[in-house]
């Protein structure tokens, strides 16, 4: 696994983590989003369909897992297809790019966890079909990933807002703005000042 010095460095340099450890080549917009996770508590990304945002989300999960002790990373999306077939598969793909990482991070159909720490060092996939999808998570380091956020009901966001009252919690939302109201829409409109916002095309 990474040395203590490397962990301290990469915790503040997610772009370099993605390049050095995952052997990926983020485009300029993806780099800005990754850096926003260090510099801002809440990041919201408007994007079209495509793998570009799924890659950023997957990189973010793996980066946070490897550079923060005992994190919890709840991930959600409106449908099982978006969550498991796309995002979760993307996480599996990128972690395999580093043999050491691949052996230390254990991937299952619904969970990614640090070897030997399944209950306290993990990312977990929960579909946004029930109000309690994102409830019950407590840790010093939290990263919420909400994919296709425009299709996620506002009540799902309520526990996220509660968690974001603590300094170690962060939020990354991505989605195609298909709704003209709601939590995600507001993050690019009336609540825009509270967020670091981006607009990218869906592309590889």
Regions inferred by a protein language model and the residue ranges of each:
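Phosphate/NTP-binding elements of NTP-utilizing enzymes
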Residues: 1-204
């Amino acid at each position: 696994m990474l040395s203590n010095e490397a962990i301290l460095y990469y915790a503040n340099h997610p772009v370099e983590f993605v390049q050095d450890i995952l052997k990926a080549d983020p485009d300029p917009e993806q780099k800005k989003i990754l850096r926003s996770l260090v510099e801002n508590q809440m990041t919201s990304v408007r994007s079209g369909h495509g793998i570009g945002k799924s890659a950023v989300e997957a990189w973010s999960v793996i980066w946070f897992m490897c550079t923060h002790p005992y994190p919890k990373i709840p991930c959600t999306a409106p449908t099982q297809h978006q969550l498991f077939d796309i995002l979760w598969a993307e996480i599996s793909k990128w972690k395999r790019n580093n043999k050491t990482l691949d052996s230390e991070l254990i991937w299952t159909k619904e969970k990614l966890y640090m070897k030997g720490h399944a209950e306290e060092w993990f990312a977990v996939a929960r579909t946004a079909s029930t109000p309690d999808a994102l409830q019950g998570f407590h840790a010093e380091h939290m990263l919420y990933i909400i994919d296709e956020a425009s299709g996620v009901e506002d009540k799902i966001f309520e526990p996220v807002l509660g968690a974001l009252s603590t300094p170690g919690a962060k939020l990354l939302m991505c989605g195609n703005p298909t709704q003209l109201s709601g939590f995600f829409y507001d993050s690019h409109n009336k609540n825009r000042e509270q967020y670091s916002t981006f607009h990218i095309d869906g592309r590889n």
